[in-house]
Amino acid sequence: MEYFKNVPKVQYEGPKSNNPYAFKFYNPDEIIDGKPLKEHLRFAVAYWHTFTGTGTDPFGASTMQRPWDRFSDPMDIAKARVEAAFEFFEKLDVPFFCFHDRDIAPEGDNLRETNKNLGTIVAMIKDYLKTSKAKVLWGTANLFSHPRYVHGAATSCNADVFAYAAAQVKKALEITKELGGQNYVFWGGREGYETLLNTDTELELDNLARFLHMAVEYAKEIGFEGQLLIEPKPKEPTKHQYDFDAAHVYAFLKKYGLDKYFKLNIEVNHATLAGHEFQHELRYARINNILGSIDANMRDMLLGWDTDQFPTDIRMTTLAMYEVIKMGGFDKGGLNFDAKVRRASFEPEDLFIAHIAGMDAFAKGFKVAYRLVKDGVFDKFIEERYKSYKEGIGAEIVSGRANFKTLEEYALNNPKIENKSGKQELLESILNQYLFTE
């Protein structure tokens, strides 16, 4: 069965094309810095938003028109989604996809039945992977949707829930390895608290660390060679989540001796919910060598929640790819579109249009960022701005030879301090020049 009959294979046609099913800026085989653009960007489709999203919200029922919804049996729907997914990957020519365990197979009446369902669908996906160009960027376990996780998973007050979550992650690690996944993600949507009045914060954080250490050990035991990732988010669905932002996660990893095993999967919306620009989170992760992968989307800044819109802001994508290029590019990570079409964009064709828009936005952003890095636009200014640390008292500070006494003596004998302009407006103007010209 063909699920997307109205959509041809998506091709690159250039910026003057009016074809909604064509790339305008993303030419996957375009060589930049000795490597095809598709290898720089490593795009991935999010299985959950694309194939299981219904369009429901707190005020209304589902709106999405999906051809696989004609089935009633959950396993029949799951099988149809696999067929539709690989047709989608092929037509979009996307190299990767990501999934939660509960995205690909329905939960059964008990853990054994659930794992049996997973086994059936994983076998089906494996067959498709034999002939498909698409690969698994990362897998993960859904430890937030089922009512058992009302108090959390690894941080639950109920040890039975901790045990169930461990069993679920064990299976998710196994199937991610079986499907050739290059990463495994932990996102603690329920790992946090609503009120401190009933929370043993120390025990919860200690238990979260114990859980992650167990995961590390099991990944080693089964020979999983992918990168383990943690995805920060400050809130939603939980009022206060322990993986608040990149700095919080890094401090947690350092405290519990986990920093050598984990990197971060940074999402745009999660950064802004934490009160940061996306580039801030990427920069912090990059300079601490913990930037692993990206969940690409965009937030409506007039709304107070995680809107998961497809990214179309070229300035944002440019500054994001600037950090990725400065890092040396992705290793095992990539750009996963953790984004959903709007509730009113309910036709199956909208899934392609949305992904094309996001892929074009990041392709354009990458090209602009590459020119910025190559020309040293910001590097030259920053080097000049901090040149006082290259010689004299600045060099003494950086080398560790200075102390409070020597610095006081210097300050007493150097009463005149001269600062220079930060030139923010000039730099923003230069950025605009690069954005609006080839």
From Swiss-Prot:
Primary location group: cytoplasm
Residues reported to bind Mg(2+) 1: E231, E267, D295, D338
First-level EC class: isomerase
PROSITE patterns listed in its UniProt record: XYLOSE_ISOMERASE
Keyword set, alphabetical order: Carbohydrate metabolism, Cytoplasm, Isomerase, Magnesium, Metal-binding, Xylose metabolism
Cofactors (names): Mg(2+)
Binding residues annotated for Mg(2+) 2, in chain numbering: E267, H270, D306, D308
Molecular function GO labels: magnesium ion binding; xylose isomerase activity
Subcellular location(s) per record: Cytoplasm
EC number assigned by the record: 5.3.1.5
Catalyzed chemical reaction(s): alpha-D-xylose = alpha-D-xylulofuranose
UniProt-listed InterPro entries: Xyl_isomerase-like_sf, Xyl_isomerase-like_TIM-brl, Xylose_isom_bac, Xylose_isomerase
GO biological-process terms attached to the record: D-xylose metabolic process
Catalytic site positions: H100, D103
Cofactor binding description: Binds 2 magnesium ions per subunit.
GO cellular component: cytoplasm
HAMAP family reported in the protein's UniProt record: Xylose_isom_A (MF_00455)
Record note on quaternary structure: Homotetramer.
PANTHER family: PTHR48408, XYLOSE ISOMERASE (PTHR48408:SF1)
Similarity annotation: Belongs to the xylose isomerase family.
Protein name from the UniProt record: Xylose isomerase
